[in-house]
């Protein structure tokens, strides 16, 4: 059987859907040779590669209402709505330990997408030889809500700005068949934003401004390519089967739990698809 890659969309706390899907995969013993994630999708996938079932849900259940995790106070004091040092420092190192040894020893090729602020182009980081927590922080640093992250001589932000759905990248890496986990329901399309906020905040980085203001177009183009591949049998797309109307900063633990449970159910159903078996 031809190897399949795994492509994971971001979406901040909508990523609890992805957490449920990946836990369903862990329960079934399903692994992939290639995983590429964007923003929250990459962060959540780490616990899949490290085989820590349920870790993503425990983090959100425990800390969603902790101001260190997400609060206006964070934004006013650090420039980031989400507490990035808490999420990518205290939690994995001390509070809900991440299994670095299993993650690093995994044969899975794990790729995280970031955006180069100065070029307005995506940058792809493998897990080997990198400070992966800093890369994850950069990939999840949403424009307007997070400061720019410096790493390896680059200025980085949210990978979703330049490659929200890295289908084309997976093809370039030799994976013609892929499982794609989306955090939006069927039929979703992005709309063009107003152009002035990006110009006002990031005017010194014109290529980034262009990326922010055209993200809607690249997202919709990538989604159309994925749906075409799905129709042709080259992609298995797992997306929310019910639209629970979850926001990026959802505060209801009950709704986030429902989203996680939906992901587990949809993931388990996806495993029954014959495209997994040929």
Where are these regions (language model features)?
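Patatin-like phospholipase
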Residues: 1-38, 46-278
């Amino acid at each position: 059987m031809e190897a399949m890659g795994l492509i994971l969309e971001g979406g901040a706390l909508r990523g609890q859907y992805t957490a449920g899907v990946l836990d369903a995969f862990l329960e079934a013993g399903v692994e992939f040779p290639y995983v590429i994630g964007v923003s929250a999708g990459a962060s959540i996938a780490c616990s899949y590669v490290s085989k820590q079932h349920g870790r993503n849900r425990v983090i959100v259940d425990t800390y969603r209402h902790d101001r260190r995790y997400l609060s206006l106070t964070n934004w006013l004091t650090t420039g980031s709505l989400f507490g990035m040092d808490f999420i990518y420092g205290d939690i994995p190192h001390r509070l809900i330990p991440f299994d670095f040894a299993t993650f690093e020893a995994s044969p899975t090729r794990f790729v995280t997408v970031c955006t180069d602020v100065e070029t307005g182009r995506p940058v792809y980081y493998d897990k080997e030889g990198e400070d992966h927590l800093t890369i994850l922080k950069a990939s999840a640093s949403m424009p307007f809500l997070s400061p720019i992250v410096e790493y390896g001589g680059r200025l980085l932000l949210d990978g979703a700005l330049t490659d929200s759905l890295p289908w084309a990248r997976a093809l370039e890496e030799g994976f013609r068949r892929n499982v794609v986990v989306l955090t939006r329901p069927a039929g979703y399309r992005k709309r063009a934003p107003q152009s002035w906020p990006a110009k006002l905040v990031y005017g010194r980085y014109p290529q980034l401004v262009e990326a922010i203001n055209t993200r809607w177009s690249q997202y919709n183009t990538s989604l159309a390519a994925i749906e075409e591949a799905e129709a042709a049998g080259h992609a298995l797309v797992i997306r929310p089967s019910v639209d629970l109307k979850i926001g990026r900063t959802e505060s209801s633990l009950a709704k986030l739990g429902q989203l996680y449970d939906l992901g587990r159910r949809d993931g388990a159903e996806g495993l029954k698809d014959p495209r997994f078996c040929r």
